[in-house]
């Protein structure tokens, strides 16, 4: 095992901006994409062929500050409330369409796509995390790692994305996943 730190400088970040967009074939709302693609290049130069990613860990184990906010939000009482928070809350949406599509219409389409079968009124935070797992994770994380790996002829593996492990984590009540003082209580 030969660990190597990868340093990301402002010059590297700028130099890999266009390559990250080209490889993804789209712009996504992640400021880390230039650093991610550069890291893939460094791995390839060290003859790495298969990469292991820890993606999904935060979503499975309530590791983000937003998870604490969801748990504390008293306005989230229904699936629609949770979807409203997910679609309209959190990070502000980029005004790509100049708001031509009303936000409520976007919310209605989202709810048609993702049914309330994921809603657990006893654990709204686990419901939120499950929603992240079926939306953000495949669209952003898995897609990004797959395309960046392909750009350098590497294959990405996602050990936390196994069905068994995901079901295990989602069966743990969210109250056990973080404490009042610490996110990622279980990691």
Q: What are the language-model segments listed below?
A:
Residues 40, 133-141:
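Core structural elements
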Residues 1-128, 144-187:
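ATP-dependent adenylate-handling active sites, centered on carboxylate activation for C-N bond formation
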């Amino acid at each position: 095992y030969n660990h190597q730190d990868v340093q990301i400088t402002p010059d590297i970040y700028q130099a890999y901006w266009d390559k990250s967009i080209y490889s993804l074939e789209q712009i996504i709302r992640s400021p880390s994409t230039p650093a991610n693609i550069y890291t893939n290049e460094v791995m390839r130069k060290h003859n790495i062929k298969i990469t292991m990613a820890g993606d999904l860990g935060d979503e499975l184990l309530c590791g983000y500050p937003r998870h604490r906010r969801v748990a504390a939000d008293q306005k989230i009482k229904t699936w629609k409330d949770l979807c409203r928070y997910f679609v309209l809350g959190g990070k502000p949406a980029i005004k790509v369409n100049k708001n031509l599509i009303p936000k409520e219409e976007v919310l209605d389409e989202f709810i048609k796509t993702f049914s309330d079968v994921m809603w657990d009124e006893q654990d709204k935070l686990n419901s939120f995390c499950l929603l992240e797992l079926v939306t953000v994770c495949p669209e952003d994380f898995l897609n990004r790692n797959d395309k960046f790996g392909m750009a350098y002829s590497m294959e990405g593996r996602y050990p936390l994305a196994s069905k068994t492990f995901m079901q295990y984590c989602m069966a743990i009540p969210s109250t056990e996943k973080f404490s009042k003082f610490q996110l990622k209580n279980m990691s």
